Amino acid sequence: KVFNGMMNPVEVLQTHYYHPHLKWVQFSGDLSNTKFEAGKVIEFRISDTDFRHYTPALYDQAKGICEVFFYLHGYGPGSAWADRLEAGDQMKLMGPGGRMSYQEANNYHVCFGDESSLGLCLNLQNKAKGQGDSFQCLLELEEKHHTWPELISLQARSLGKSEAFPAQEAIEFLEAWPQQKWQQWQEASFYLSGRAKSIQRIRKTLLAKGVHTKQIITFPYWAEGKKGL
């Protein structure tokens, strides 16, 4: 658990399955005492011993509404907990907090992730639109999930996912950018989330392209053999 003394009672207002493995949940509660920035995470207690953090797609303190997209991969207690959620369920929401946040001073933003990153990417996209900033989103997804971004109004390039070569298609896509585009986007803020190995490889590529380390914000959501990073 990473948030101490920041617990707010919430109730599940409604749920919707965009796909058998992609569930949207809207939570409602008094969030007026909280402060949210795009990119921050919230946390739920999912069992007596387990906590899981998620990045909201929408968080509105004034209206008391929080929306989360859950990737139901079926591999752990977090997935099972999210699948069981239904209207009327009550729980405590912890946060928001975490080290990732929208870099307001920048006008160019690039988000990378996978199925576990949809909420983060949508939240950052909507923030960028509101600011009039330029935004690009790259997602490595299983082929059967390539339609997911469109289903949730996320403008993203869906790329193939490889177990053996993490982020390979995303790296090839970035390396194919013409020099003129790199000159324009080299000072961008890069938000890297999802699989730890993919983040490591993308980060290495960006550094080799001359992107400064302070422009790269990372948040690994999962890694092989580890439960709930």
Where do the PLM segments sit?
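Extended, composition-driven regions rather than compact fold-specific motifs
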Residues: K1-L229
